[in-house]
Swiss-Prot record:
[4Fe-4S] cluster binds at residues 176, 179, 267. The keyword Iron applies. It comes from Methanocaldococcus jannaschii (strain ATCC 43067 / DSM 2661 / JAL-1 / JCM 10045 / NBRC 100440) (Methanococcus jannaschii). Belongs to the TtcA family. This is Probable sulfurtransferase. GO terms for biological process: tRNA wobble position uridine thiolation. Zn(2+) 1 binds at residues 40, 42, 58, 61. InterPro entries: CTU1-like_ATP-bd, Ncs6/Tuc1/Ctu1, Rossmann-like_a/b/a_fold, TilS/TtcA_N, tRNA_thiolation_TtcA_Ctu1, TtuA-like_LIM_N, UPF0021_CS. Its cofactor is [4Fe-4S] cluster; Mg(2+). Keywords: 4Fe-4S, ATP-binding, Iron, Iron-sulfur, Magnesium, Metal-binding, Nucleotide-binding, Transferase, Zinc. Disulfide bonds: none annotated. Zn(2+) 2 binds at residues 316, 319, 328, 331. GO terms for cellular component: cytosolic tRNA wobble base thiouridylase complex.
Length: 341
């Protein structure tokens, strides 16, 4: 017997109602589950998903997590009374975030002193802009600032070194090779002069991984060993790296949520081609296996325990600073520059 038009209408209505009901239930469950996933463990709304830990973090818990890791790197021996820490500050995100975190970690430590060192290499249109960011930051957070100029210290700006083709005459391939050595020399010199117990450098986890893998690929065993060494005493101020366990992405995010203004433009002399390619390789590995950056660092630190190579440290005959030969690299360059000029 055929259904009447009335019965067919009722059946169609019931079918539509059932479909509608299931769709609403599915949508409700999806929204509810999504909401549940996007909550931080503290109950607040999450704003960041940390893939390698499989955690959703709210802004406050994210901030605490970053500072906890920096504190873990430093340890109780460094976070203590009557300590003086020099901070190498450039105006970029890493150094300013590092300075901000150190300010937070030491704000309740009696007689702890922080002093920032800003090295002005003399790069027009770049370093003068960075200096403005640094001065504003140090003023806002009441940090002592000492500005160190290449021109005052070695008699030349980096612009002059490059413009006059002194690099090729010194048998130096890139401006970064010259600049990096001189910067480290000057930071150590002034940290020592100011009586600092430690010198903080803003290398993040990505920087570590890139340098480690670049040295592996190039087979540069000497650099692999020296990169992990922490020289101290006898003319060296021990270097500390509070951002060692913090990925670059999270350094940027920390700067954003704390409204830290920093210089975003890269140095015009920076040569990022090889490092940039290595960065891409690490990003691919991290995407496929979250946490691989930490694995690279841990593996390297384990390897260092087996590379117990002792290098004889001498004193430079000119400046008195520690070096491996009779004259340190900076003094040997300055001698050659005088001969060239």
């Amino acid at each position: 017997m055929l259904d009447s038009p009335h019965n067919l209408y009722i059946k169609k209505f019931m079918l539509c109602y059932i479909i509608y009901y299931f769709l609403i239930c599915h949508l409700y469950n999806h929204i509810f589950n999504l909401r549940e996933i996007m909550l931080c463990s503290c109950g607040n709304e999450a704003f960041y998903y940390q893939k390698y830990s499989n955690r959703h973090l709210c802004k406050e818990c994210f901030k605490k997590d970053i500072e906890r890791r920096a504190k873990k790197v430093l340890g109780k021996d460094i976070i203590r009374n009557n300590v003086k820490i020099g901070i190498g500050i450039s105006g970029g995100k890493d150094s300013l975030v590092m300075a901000y975190i150190l300010k937070e970690l030491f704000k309740h430590i009696p007689n702890a002193k922080l002093i920032c060192f800003f090295v002005d290499e003399g790069i027009k249109g770049f370093r003068n802009i960075a200096e403005k960011y640094v001065k504003e930051f140090c003023k806002e957070y009441n940090l002592d600032l000492k500005i160190i100029k290449f021109e005052d210290e070695i008699g030349y700006t980096l612009d002059e070194i490059v413009k006059n083709d002194y690099l090729s005459k010194l048998n130096i391939g890139k401006p970064c090779s010259f600049c990096g050595v001189v910067r480290r020399y000057l930071l150590n010199k002034h940290a020592l002069k100011e009586g600092c117990d430690y010198l903080a450098i803003g290398h993040n986890l990505d920087d570590f991984c890139q340098t480690i893998l670049m040295n592996y690929v190039e087979g540069n065993i000497k650099n692999i060993i020296q990169f992990g060494k922490e020289f101290e005493g006898g003319g060296f101020v021990k270097r500390i790296k509070p951002l060692k366990l913090i990925p670059e992405e999270e350094v940027k995010l920390y700067a954003e949520i704390n409204n830290i203004k920093y210089q975003r433009e890269p140095c015009p002399y920076s040569s990022l081609s090889y490092r940039h390619r290595m960065k891409k390789v690490i990003e691919i590995l991290e995407e496929e296996k979250p946490g691989v950056k930490f694995s690279i660092l841990r593996g390297y630190e384990k390897l260092l325990k087996y590379l117990n190579v002792k290098e004889e440290i001498r004193r430079c005959e000119i400046c008195g600073f520690p070096c491996s030969g009779n004259i340190c690299k900076v003094c040997s360059w300055l001698i050659k520059l005088k001969e060239i000029k």
